[in-house]
Amino acid sequence: MFASDVPRLTGWAPERWPVAADWRPVVDRFLTSETGRALERFVRARLAGGAVIYPQQPLRALALTPLAQVKVVILGQDPYHGPGQAEGLAFSVAPGVRPPPSLCNIFREIARDPLLSPGNLIPHGDGSLVAWARQGVLLLNSCLTVEEGQPASHAGRGWEALTDEVVKAVASIDNPVVFLLWGAHAQAKQRLIAATARQGGRAAADHLVLTANHPSPLSARRPPLPFLGCGHFGLANAYLLQHGCAPIAW
């Protein structure tokens, strides 16, 4: 594949970024806010300056996983910044792309989780996690765009305001939800989740929040909360079953 063939963001065009109907009010409020308009100006300027920006569909997580169907939330930081990697879902890579080290550790943890039976597993021929998203796993990055070869290049430019509202919307729903918070960046959302639940008259315990280190090889085995051995995937399914919900086929 030539560089020019790699899917990328070609313009600021939210009308071409589909989202599920129940996410539309959240997205529209953000897009018309001053923060949303400032982000639009920034992205347009970077594109005009020749920046290569990924992914092609920044809001894809909100298209594949409607709010009413969310069972599990996995929070990432920002999209992969290599050509052809990002597909708009946290930790997921486009079909045919070799899974990065963090995703390899995620698959390794699933394979060793003693609470998961073969019926809870699906074969992964590549690193795409679209099948999870379609089962109700919201794979949400805090920042939804990135420039090629420049991690965190769009951090602090406004996307975080939208993704915080997404987290708050999930924390407000009546359905039981599991939040998997890996690493300090994701765990910073724990207070937001609890505060939102309380504001809605829910006990924080109504949702299950599990924390561990980030699955990156740099931290996956580091105490006191190593990712490898955390058992989060089996615990999530046990919680869903306890609340009358179908488990996730990981």
From Swiss-Prot:
Species name: Albidiferax ferrireducens (strain ATCC BAA-621 / DSM 15236 / T118) (Rhodoferax ferrireducens)
Xref: NCBIfam families: PRK05254.1-1, PRK05254.1-2, PRK05254.1-4, PRK05254.1-5, ung
This protein's name: Uracil-DNA glycosylase
GO biological process: base-excision repair, AP site formation via deaminated base removal
Active site per UniProt: 78 (proton acceptor)
Protein's gene: ung
GO CC term (a single one): cytoplasm
Gene3D superfamilies: Uracil-DNA glycosylase-like domain
Main subcellular location of this protein, as a coarse class: cytoplasm
Top EC class for this record: hydrolase
UniProt keyword list: Cytoplasm, DNA damage, DNA repair, Hydrolase
Record EC number: 3.2.2.27
